[in-house]
Amino acid sequence: FQKNDINYGWVMVVVVFTLSGLAFGSMASISVFLKPVSLEFDWSRGQTSFAYTVASFSSAAFGVFWGYVADKYGTKWFGLAGALSMGFILFSLSSLDSIYKFYLLYFLFGAFGSALLFSPLYANVGFWFRENPGLALGIAASGGAVGQAFVPHISGILIEASGWRDAYIYLALIYLAISLPIALLIQESPWREGARQDAETEERDFPLSEKAVVAWISFAVIFCCVCTVSYTHLTLPTTTIV
């Protein structure tokens, strides 16, 4: 595939599928680390799972910021920065010694891991396709669901085999081995580069303004995301003998 070839858009689909799967999967794996971490430090379930809340809020806030940066400068290095951030943070979690460090690291994961790899890269995929962008975006976004299915399972196996601290280290190494090479494949679509350099007003025949559309979609997405928060606690009942 050549950079200027529209078929390179499918390379971007694979790249974003993989990176979003790793990012979403790591967020979901908090549910697997919840029990061993809370038992070692005698934290309550609520205290420990609050890390997921912190990561979610930081991902949302920084997602807006990174989206602005992507519009101005492109996303070519977003994948590499996100990959390095995820690896570094997962490795740092292995040396956890306080709940405040736990919150800080997951805040950073949301801000510099998830936020870099979600919406900015999804937008990148959309710009590669003038036809069937919905299909391409749907495939790319499905990587998040696949990651949520497999990464927690792999994390559980690693925890059982070597403990939660070593599991974080192994995850960091796996993430770096997968994400770094694939992140180097990220390219901007020629159409987006041209549009950014030659800004012009696009005429649209649509009853709602752009701001109204964004507001309604954001409102809907918030409720969709709220429904996923409960899975943070789903692992404990299945691993606790009453």
Regions found by a protein language model. Name each.
Residues 116-129:
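Intracellular juxtamembrane helix-capping segments at the cytosolic ends
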Residues 9-26, 211-227:
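Pair of pore-lining "gating" transmembrane helices in MFS-fold secondary transporters
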Residues 232-238:
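Conserved small/polar residues in nucleotide/adenosyl-binding loops
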